[in-house]
Amino acid sequence: MLEDSFLISHCVRFDIKGRKYIDTPQKYYFEDLGLRNARLGFRQVEETHLMENLIYNELKMRGYIVDVGVVPTRTKETDGTYNRSLLEVDFVCNRGSERIYVQSAYRLPTEEKKQQETASLLKIDDSFRKVVITEDLVKRHMDDNGVEWVNIYDFLMSSEV
């Protein structure tokens, strides 16, 4: 009902390695952050969620079809067993033949946090662009792993991701 009134929209989960959509819970985003804040009585002002919602809205406005990505991964434990898990990519953006993987990271104060935010992007074995958008004041650049880093303000002011 709320989707029919254009108050919220949803993202479907997409298995990046398996290249198929997954029937798991979808993520929902508000079309208007002001209405979201008013509905919540301005009590839940979580910058991380607001920034992710803002990036989603901007990507949709730029004409992308936006999904949430998941990357299956296996890690070897100290006892020799393997642990399977799913890592999330905030947005898988498609427009024609163009695809971009976007990770929203509000602040990255430590190297450990940077590794945590890029882990899912680095597990993707294709040549499409991988971008981290952060509130930190970073100059747009590409790191040694091929991940682009963009400040949220530069992202919003630029016409490209």
Where are these regions (language model features)?
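Accessory nucleic acid-recognition modules appended to NTPase machines
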Residues: 1-99
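Short glycine-/acidic-enriched loop or helix-start segments at secondary-structure transitions
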Residues: 40, 112-113, 141-143
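Active-site ExK catalytic segment of metal-dependent nucleases
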Residues: 90, 94-110, 117
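Short, charged, amphipathic alpha-helix that recurs within catalytic cores of restriction-modification
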Residues: 107, 112-129
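Short beta-strand/turn micro-motifs composed of small residues
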Residues: 134
